[in-house]
Design a protein with these regions (language model features):
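Helix N-cap motif at beta-to-alpha junctions
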Residues: 12-16
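Polyanion/phosphate-binding surface patch
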Residues: 1-8
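Short, mixed-charge low-complexity intrinsically disordered segments
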Residues: 207-254
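An acidic, glycine-/histidine-flanked metal-binding catalytic module
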Residues: 66-171, 175
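A short, exposed loop/beta-hairpin motif centered on an aromatic-Gly-Thr core
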Residues: 181-190, 213
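Short Gly/Thr-rich strand-loop-strand
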Residues: 24, 30-62
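A short, charged, amphipathic alpha-helix used as a generic interaction element across diverse proteins
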Residues: 191-206
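Hydrophobic side chains in well-ordered alpha-helices
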Residues: 17-23, 195-198, 226
Length: 266
């Protein structure tokens, strides 16, 4: 079965996600719900959260030629979408495939733990104080090892620079983490060999002290198409991560008391 297309709705919070799902479920449309995945109640192993609806298209008249093809609808909160945007951005600039369950173990663990922490902020997953302390400690450690804040800020900056370079078919991005320098150069289609040579030299020069990526304009456009309103904008992800890392014992205790007060009596 093939996809006819898809759409994504980004809403304020988790109650709004379920309200929208209810609207789809009770709406007056002819399409048949073929599959339903609640990744908020049961997140994917990599930490992905959201709701996915797969409908079989049912049309009339000229539209009947598409009958049986699938339409995928994704529902996410703003924070869940910020997390997914950050994953896509890191994949692009570090040449990994975290989204596909591959890539560096530390990055995968970081995003998985960040997803857990973000779910606590959104009150979708109550969590004891000890567990929150463990998650915060893990995020502090992984954020430091991966230099997350500096990298994400620089990736967003790199995208802005890329969009200022016209008539390029490839972009060479060099992020020097030691000297905190970012360099972006564009190469035309005729300069592909030169771009590859410069890339190899930059990789040798920076080694483990930075990120070097040679990215095609097609890949940049693909990311822009997938995230048109948040293209490589990791601002909300960083702000949410900051909020988690600011957890203090009193705040954690208050949140735990709030959770316990809402539990039904046994």
């Amino acid at each position: 079965m093939q996809d006819i297309g898809g759409c994504r709705a980004i809403v304020r919070d988790i109650p709004a996600v379920y309200q929208l799902w209810h609207a789809f479920d009770t709406g007056r449309h002819r399409h048949i719900l073929d599959d339903f995945k609640d990744y908020i109640e049961e997140p994917k192993e990599d930490g992905y959260r959201g709701i996915h609806l797969i409908y079989k298209y049912v049309g009339r008249g000229n539209g009947s030629v598409y009958n049986g093809l699938r339409i995928e609808v994704q529902l996410r909160t703003q924070i869940q979408h910020a997390w997914a945007t950050a994953v896509e951005t890191v994949d692009l600039f570090t040449r990994q495939a975290i989204k596909a369950g591959q890539g560096q173990v530390q990055w995968r663990e970081f995003f998985c733990v960040a997803s857990e922490a973000f779910s606590v902020l959104e009150h979708s997953e109550p969590m004891p104080m000890e567990e929150r302390s463990r998650i915060k400690a893990l995020l502090v450690d992984l954020s430091s090892q991966l230099d997350v804040f500096n990298r994400l800020h620089r990736y967003s900056e790199a995208v802005q620079l890329v969009e200022q370079i016209k008539e390029a078919s490839q972009y060479l991005l060099e992020l020097d983490l030691v000297n905190d320098e970012l360099r972006v150069r564009g190469f035309t289609a005729k300069e592909r060999d030169k771009a590859q040579k410069e890339y190899t030299e930059a990789e040798k020069r920076l080694g483990e002290n930075g990120d070097v990526v040679l990215v095609s304009v097609e890949n940049v456009n693909a990311l822009r198409k997938a995230f048109p309103n948040y293209f490589a904008d990791t601002t909300l992800f960083i702000a949410t991560l900051d909020e988690v890392l600011a957890w203090e014992s009193d705040e954690v205790n208050n949140l735990l008391i709030e959770w316990l007060s809402k539990r039904p009596e046994e």
